[in-house]
């Protein structure tokens, strides 16, 4: 187990006032009520499943079939990916892209094809040089004015630029250049290109949640005159089949949550189990990860309760035995806790006990020990923040960052996400993850800094809480906006680290790395306009509605 810190001496006396005023939190109740308790009665009928299989084979054949040129091949693969069905054809797509990588045709060198090829190959780990874009610059080093009329090319360059890594100045310039010209052009474009551009300016492919983006692109793709009818029909059926599976999972989780009765027992805590499931379905949506999704949703739900206990209700005196109990991970510790803490402590241990039972048949109990240790470290970091708040202590920015990165919970979620994966995860995977590799560091920075900006900018943090933005402003004598800009630069740098870690050869299989990529994507979607989890913003409501409530008309 992780080393104990709950008895660590503090630098100043701590209050022992039994009547200490508790932190105030006033979270809105769940906007979903009991809506997801029951799964829709209508199952996928046998005829639809048979049609799904027929279309799947048709699409598979089209992926591997020769096409007139690489542009057509790239565009078809891109459509398969953006419609959310590429998980069915992983090997076929990889083989086709490897062939394209080794057989580049310079004759197809327009901006659209160059950018699309660059993006798809980068997405799959190929180290394509950004020098391929130099031919679109003039002698002064600026992008040629002639490319501004090629909206499709600009859009692809814009999307490709989000795959950039450190030192690729031309792609940093491309983001600004394409954003400016696409923003100017969008109002004069015809549908569906206008919708593609408008949506892209709000959400890039690289940083969007695959299922949310697939749901949106389905509505765009069907309006493209040259769309492939078999692919479109397959994607629609596949979306509805996945939606039904996800609804069944969420119904099961909601029943578990309702039985815990935390709304009554812990009224200070956020009731966000539906949003938690949406978060985790962003981490992995594929059918083979059903068990992992359910386990990880329960973990994020309990982590949210633990967070609110530290941050929104418990006194520091109560948090000492609470942290100690989590460190010891023993149900016997429950007798040392205040009455209101007992239900959540028992539920926390029960979630991990169930996890152990579920993975035991495959001899994977060792994975749960890593997951427990990650949760313990999270609780220890929460205790440090609670001590700072009690003492009204303002740490330096670097001191704050060292503790705040673990408190965002992303290292814990990344490690725990591996528990529910198959044989691709090994003991070496957990040893690697426990050593804080760059991609987990990067996704954690994205989470922490986006959360900090959102909480401060949209006033989502209590006045007595220690704020990273306030620490930075005070230490460096800058305005709030200047601090936001610095934090956002850290986020952009972290995204470059994420992209770098996908370039072959990689430390870990892509499926392992995808967990951290998708965790970062969740933050980009939910926290760009405030804390979309706690305050259930437009992105969360829209995503949950489109992915879990509204089926696609066939």
Curated annotation (Swiss-Prot):
A GO molecular function assigned to this protein is:
(+)-delta-cadinene synthase activity
Residues that coordinate or bind Mg(2+) 1: 307, 311
A biological process (GO) of this protein is: diterpenoid biosynthetic process
The question of whether Glycosyltransferase is a record keyword is answered with no
Ranges for the region named Disordered are 1-21
- Give the EC class as a word: lyase
**Which pathway or pathways does this protein act in?**
Secondary metabolite biosynthesis; terpenoid biosynthesis
Q: Which CDD domains match?
A: Terpene_cyclase_plant_C1
| Cofactor names | Mg(2+)
Q: How is the cofactor bound?
A: Binds 3 Mg(2+) ions per subunit.
Q: Which residues hold Mg(2+) 2? A: 307, 311
Q: Does the keyword Membrane apply?
A: no
Q: Which domain of life is it from?
A: Eukaryota
Its EC number is 4.2.3.13
Pfam families (UniProt xref)? Terpene_synth, Terpene_synth_C
Please tell me where Mg(2+) 3 binds in this chain.
451, 455
Q: Where is this motif: DDXXD motif?
A: 307-311
Question: What InterPro entries does the entry give?
Answer: Isoprenoid_synthase_dom_sf, Terpene_cyclase-like_1_C, Terpene_cyclase_plant_C1, Terpene_synth_N, Terpene_synth_N_sf, Terpene_synthase-like, Terpene_synthase_metal-bd, Terpenoid_cyclase/PrenylTrfase
Record's catalysed reaction(s): (2E,6E)-farnesyl diphosphate = (1S,8aR)-delta-cadinene + diphosphate
What residue spans carry the Low complexity bias annotation?
Answer: 1-16
Report keywords, A-Z: Lyase, Magnesium, Metal-binding
Q: What is known of its domains?
A: The Asp-Asp-Xaa-Xaa-Asp/Glu (DDXXD/E) motif is important for the catalytic activity, presumably through binding to Mg(2+).
Give a short account of what the protein does: Responsible for the cyclization of trans,trans-farnesyl diphosphate (FPP) to (+)-delta cadinene.
Family indicated by similarity: Belongs to the terpene synthase family.
Protein's UniProt name: (+)-delta-cadinene synthase isozyme C2
* Organism annotation: Gossypium arboreum
The taxonomy runs: Eukaryota, Viridiplantae, Streptophyta, Embryophyta, Tracheophyta
């Amino acid at each position: 187990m992780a080393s104990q810190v709950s008895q660590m001496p503090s630098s100043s006396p701590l209050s022992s006032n039994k009547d200490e005023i508790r932190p105030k939190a006033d979270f809105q109740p769940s906007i979903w009520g009991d809506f997801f308790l029951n799964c829709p009665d209508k199952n996928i009928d046998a005829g639809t499943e048979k049609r799904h299989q027929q279309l799947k084979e048709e699409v598979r054949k089209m992926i591997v079939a020769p096409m007139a040129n690489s542009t057509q091949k790239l565009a078809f693969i891109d459509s398969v990916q953006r419609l959310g069905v590429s998980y069915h054809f992983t090997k076929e797509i990889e083989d086709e892209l490897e062939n394209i990588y080794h057989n580049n045709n310079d004759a197809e060198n327009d901006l659209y094809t160059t950018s699309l090829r660059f993006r798809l190959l980068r997405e799959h780990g190929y180290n394509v040089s950004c020098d391929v874009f130099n031919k679109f610059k003039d002698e002064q080093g600026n992008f040629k004015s002639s490319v501004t009329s090629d909206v499709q090319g600009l859009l692809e360059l814009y999307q490709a630029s989000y795959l950039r890594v450190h030192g690729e100045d031309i792609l940093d310039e491309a983001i600004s250049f394409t954003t400016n010209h696409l923003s100017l052009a969008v109002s004069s474009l015809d549908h569906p290109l206008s919708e593609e551009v408008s949506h892209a300016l709000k959400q890039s492919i690289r940083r969007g949640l695959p299922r949310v983006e697939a749901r949106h692109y389905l509505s765009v793709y069907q309006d493209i005159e040259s769309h492939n009818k078999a692919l479109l029909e397959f994607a629609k059926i596949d979306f509805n089949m996945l939606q039904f599976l996800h609804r069944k999972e969420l119904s099961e989780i909601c029943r578990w949550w309702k039985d815990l009765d935390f709304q009554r027992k812990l009224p200070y805590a956020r009731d966000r189990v539906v949003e938690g499931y949406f978060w985790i379905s962003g981490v992995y949506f594929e059918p083979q990860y059903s068990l992992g999704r359910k386990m990880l949703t329960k973990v994020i739900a309990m982590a949210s309760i633990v967070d609110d206990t530290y941050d929104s209700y418990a006194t520091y005196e109560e948090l000492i035995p609470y942290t100690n109990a989590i460190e010891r991970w023993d149900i016997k510790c429950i007798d040392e806790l205040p009455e209101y803490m007992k239900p959540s402590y028992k539920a926390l241990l029960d979630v991990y006990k169930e996890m152990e039972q579920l993975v035991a048949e495959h001899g994977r109990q060792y994975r749960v020990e890593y997951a427990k240790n990650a949760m313990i470290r999270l609780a220890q970091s929460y205790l440090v923040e609670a001590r700072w708040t009690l003492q009204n202590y303002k740490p330096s920015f670097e001191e704050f960052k060292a503790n705040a990165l673990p408190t965002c919970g992303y290292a814990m979620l990344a490690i725990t996400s591996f528990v529910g994966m198959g044989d691709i995860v090994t003991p070496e995977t957990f040893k690697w993850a426990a050593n804080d590799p760059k991609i987990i560091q990067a996704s954690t920075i994205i989470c922490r800094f986006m959360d900090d900006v959102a909480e401060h900018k949209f006033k989502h943090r209590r006045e007595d809480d220690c704020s990273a933005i306030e620490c930075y402003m005070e230490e460096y004598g800058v305005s709030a906006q200047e601090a936001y800009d610095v934090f956002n630069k850290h986020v952009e740098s972290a995204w470059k680290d994420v992209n770098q870690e996908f370039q072959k050869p990689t430390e870990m299989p892509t499926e392992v790395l995808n967990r951290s990529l998708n965790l970062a994507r969740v933050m980009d979607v939910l926290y760009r306009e405030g804390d979309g989890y706690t305050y259930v913003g437009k992105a969360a409501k829209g995503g949950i509605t489109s992915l879990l409530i509204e089926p696609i008309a066939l």
